[in-house]
Regions:
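A short linear hydrophobic-aromatic micro-motif
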Residues: 37-43, 84-87
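C-terminal structural segments of small proteins and small subunits
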Residues: 57-92
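Short, charge-patterned binding micro-sites
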Residues: 2, 40-61
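A generic structural motif
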Residues: 11-16, 59-61
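Short glycine-/aliphatic-rich beta-strand segments at the starts of folded cytosolic domains
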Residues: 3-13
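Absolute protein N-terminus
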Residues: 1-2, 92
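C-terminal binding/interaction regions
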Residues: 20
Length: 92
């Protein structure tokens, strides 16, 4: 099963695209290291206080895939300098 989430994030402490890249790199590295998922920035590359991630995992069941995505969302929430604003999850 493939589980996919689109996550829009507001970055409070960013004052430039360089700050944004630094924070996103930390989040991306942590998610990939801890959960072994794939993710990419999908939108708002030119805005320094907003971004949209796509997060994908492949698992043997929908339940496991959903658990992994939920763990990823909790991990994103752990970063105090960002706020998740919109989240959509799909299981296929």
């Amino acid at each position: 099963m493939v589980t996919y989430a689109e996550v829009e994030i507001f970055l409070y402490e960013c004052h430039s695209l360089k700050d944004k890249r630094s924070i996103l790199k930390r989040i991306k590295n942590r998610l990939q290291k801890d959960l072994n998922i794939a993710l990419s920035e999908l939108d708002f590359q030119d805005l320094w206080q907003r971004t949209k991630f796509g997060i994908v995992t492949v698992s043997e069941s929908a339940e496991i895939g959903d658990q992994i995505i939920q763990q990823a969302l909790e991990l994103i929430d752990f970063f105090t300098e960002v706020e998740r604003t919109v989240t959509n999850v799909e299981i296929r």
